[in-house]
Amino acid sequence: MNGPRTLDVVQRWFQAVVTHPDGVEGGVDSEEAQRLIRLKRNELEAVVRRSRNLTAAERLSIYANAYYTRLLECLGTYYPVLKSTLGEEVFEGFAFEYLQRYPSQSYTLDRLGESFARFLEETRPGREEGVEPDRVDWPDFLIDLANLEWNVARVFDGPGVEFQPLLTPEALRSFPAERFAEARLAPVPCLRLLSFQFPVNSYYTAARRAGEGEEVPLPGPAPERVALTRRDFVVRRYALTVAQHALLEKVLAGATVGEALAAAAGASDLDDDALAAELRAWFRLWAAEGFFQAIT
């Protein structure tokens, strides 16, 4: 396309050049850039003027380097524990490849890391010959950790209830017992449930508390279930048992309290009396921690 160079054409050409993974030279030669403005590398000054000290290519390289530097920094803020676990160089290698497959689609960058866990799943190494196909290993740990960190970020940035009334333990306790089984709990919008193959929530806590240069032992595979919510603009993480997870999963799906209790009973090996005592303690805790907005 070598017609009049409108501002729109030049802007799209500039984007194609400075965002190319092979740098400015690769960007100039790319199909998209050539479609917009056909020129050779030594003809760059027909579009971008040189300065007193820098050539056109050098000026473009400043933008190209800054573009990826900013995106890598942004991904690092979403995945700080994953970055420290892998090391900066390895993390940025993964992140750079990710940006080629899932380029930024928003000027705000607030969803830049949305598909990072999916990318790790898509690019995970094949399992070694002779290893059971359902065995979990190191890549699965990284995928779990990425999923946890992204959900923490989304809960932090997402809707919350900081200035809204919540269901208090007192209000829950005073709800008519005869209506309890058929009632429905309204969870707060920031409540999320997660299930992992590795204890990444425990690892995340240890890694965030570790001092600079302190190594945190990597855990072996062990199922872990977690609830995330936000209170007073701080993301809270709660380890869950299988029965707790089953109960809250039903609540989030809009089931009645009775249906949620049945799910918890089916997932628990406690006898009826012991489970009833546990359920009372769970509901007191969850109401105190702001899991629910109302019961109707």
Regions found by a protein language model. Give the residues of each.
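Long, charge-rich, low-complexity alpha-helical segments
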Residues: 1-176, 233, 238-296
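Short aromatic-glycine motifs in intrinsically disordered, low-complexity regions
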Residues: 178-180
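Low-complexity, glycine/alanine/valine/leucine- and proline-rich hydrophobic stretches
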Residues: 183-253
